[in-house]
């Protein structure tokens, strides 16, 4: 494991004028907060960095863009996403985590569905985003019922397409994360069949392109500090945070507040426990022949604040 920090480069290399390109998604609450307030633009200006923002529908396309050089930093993605990117050869640095929020993703069915337990998903069409945390949650839930991914019919859909399919009844279940989970509960009366408790901790990972992490440790340190402050504010001011966030993602404030209650928003540096779980996730996907090759998480660089 390589610790990536700022000490190896002279100051002028770290403060040279450049643009930090950040990818995020609707579940990236803290980055959306920083974006809406232009917090990073102000904090990074003394370091010579401006900021550009790019929105994605889910985590895997975000990390693919990071890997091919179109982004420098990824907002939080679910715990299953990095192993997929690493299996594809991505040169990514583990940057930070949000501590576990296992109830912030779940397998849901319609309220009138006869399905009451995971074993009844056998042979059913189930919607989820490939490579998302939802994918791993489904894998673990099925395994607990003596099933595998081969026992169901996967419907790899974006959250918007999956919501439409769920409401039409063209899928029997949907595996989804907040805030989409809270939205379908409140707006479509979806019933939780199983959440992540005891199956998937649902840590959320921030990642950086390794070349960027090697050259711009001071910028990453400043972003990290702002993420921590943003997380503390959201948890300390839940109603205000929901009122602010809701119009930015097209939801009502009570739905956003319900979603935020299930997330910790506690930002930390990447620790051994989170990397160990990353390896377990990679091995679980590998055992089902879902990944093209074995992933060794310990081979990936880890950013350390210096």
Where are these regions (language model features)?
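N-terminal export signals
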Residues: 1-14
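Short, glycine-/small- and polar/acidic-enriched structural segments
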Residues: 14-145, 155-156, 172-176, 200
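Small-molecule pocket liners
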Residues: 31, 101-107, 190-191, 202-206, ...
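Solvent-exposed, polar/charged alpha-helical surfaces in well-ordered, non-transmembrane soluble domains
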Residues: 38, 42, 64, 68, ...
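Pocket-lining segment of extracytoplasmic ligand-binding domains
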Residues: 80, 154-155, 160-247
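Short helix-loop capping/hinge motifs at secondary-structure junctions, enriched
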Residues: 111-119, 147-149, 211-220
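Secondary-structure end/capping motifs
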Residues: 214-292
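Conserved C-terminal helix/tail region of periplasmic/extracytoplasmic solute-binding proteins
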Residues: 285-306
């Amino acid at each position: 494991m390589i610790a990536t920090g700022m000490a190896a480069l002279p100051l002028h290399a770290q403060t040279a004028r450049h643009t930090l390109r950040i990818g995020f998604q609707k579940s990236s609450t803290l980055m959306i907060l920083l974006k809406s307030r232009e917090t990073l633009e102000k904090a990074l200006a003394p370091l010579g960095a401006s900021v550009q923002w790019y929105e994605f529908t889910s985590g895997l396309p975000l990390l693919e863009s990071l890997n091919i050089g179109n982004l420098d930093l990824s907002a939080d993605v679910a715990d299953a996403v990095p192993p997929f990117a690493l299996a594809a050869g991505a040169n990514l640095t583990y940057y930070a985590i949000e501590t576990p929020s296992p109830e912030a993703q779940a397998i849901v069915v319609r309220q009138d569905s006869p399905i009451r337990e995971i074993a009844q998903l056998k042979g059913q069409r189930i919607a989820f985003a490939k490579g998302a945390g939802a994918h791993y949650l489904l894998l673990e839930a099925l395994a607990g019922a003596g099933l595998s991914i081969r026992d169901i019919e996967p419907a790899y859909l974006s959250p918007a397409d999956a919501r439409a399919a769920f409401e039409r009844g063209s899928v029997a279940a949907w595996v989804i994360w907040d805030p989409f989970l809270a939205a379908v509960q409140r707006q479509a009366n979806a019933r939780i069949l199983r959440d992540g408790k005891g199956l998937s901790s649902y840590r959320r990972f921030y990642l950086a392109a390794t070349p960027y992490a090697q050259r711009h440790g001071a910028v990453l340190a400043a972003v990290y500090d702002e993420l921590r402050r943003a997380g503390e504010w959201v948890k300390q001011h839940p109603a205000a945070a929901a009122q602010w966030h809701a119009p930015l993602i097209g939801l009502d404030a009570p739905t956003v507040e319900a979603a935020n209650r299930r997330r910790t928003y506690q930002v930390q540096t990447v620790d051994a426990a989170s990397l160990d779980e990353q390896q377990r996730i990679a091995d679980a996907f590998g055992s089902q022949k879902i990944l093209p090759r074995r992933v060794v998480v310990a081979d990936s660089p880890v950013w350390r604040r210096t």
